[in-house]
């Protein structure tokens, strides 16, 4: 608990967000962009965060309700072979579950971003399948 307090105090005094302290400025940007994406998608708004050449299945607004940004990381092609050809630079898992899911239901699980001159844009979304509720 003391460690968290020190991190929070450092973030406050330096003007940085906690996400910037933990994940660095680039990781914090991925988290912030993902929160914007979830907000856009869960309200049914068209998001300006989608790359022109995106292959992402965006699903329905209800698929996004209850989700939030997880942990950002630089893209790892060995783990995400399907997305490697799309040349993303970042991936982030989504945390939480949309309401009313039952085993076998699918939901957005990971978002893949490409860096552009305008900022990050979504190039793909990997959907996860709920195995068990409990």
Tell me what each language-model feature is.
Residues 12-15:
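C-terminal motif of bacterial Sec signal peptides marking the signal peptidase cleavage site
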Residues 45-89:
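Short solvent-exposed beta->alpha transition segments
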Residues 79-134:
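Exposed beta-sheet edge and beta->alpha loop/turn motif
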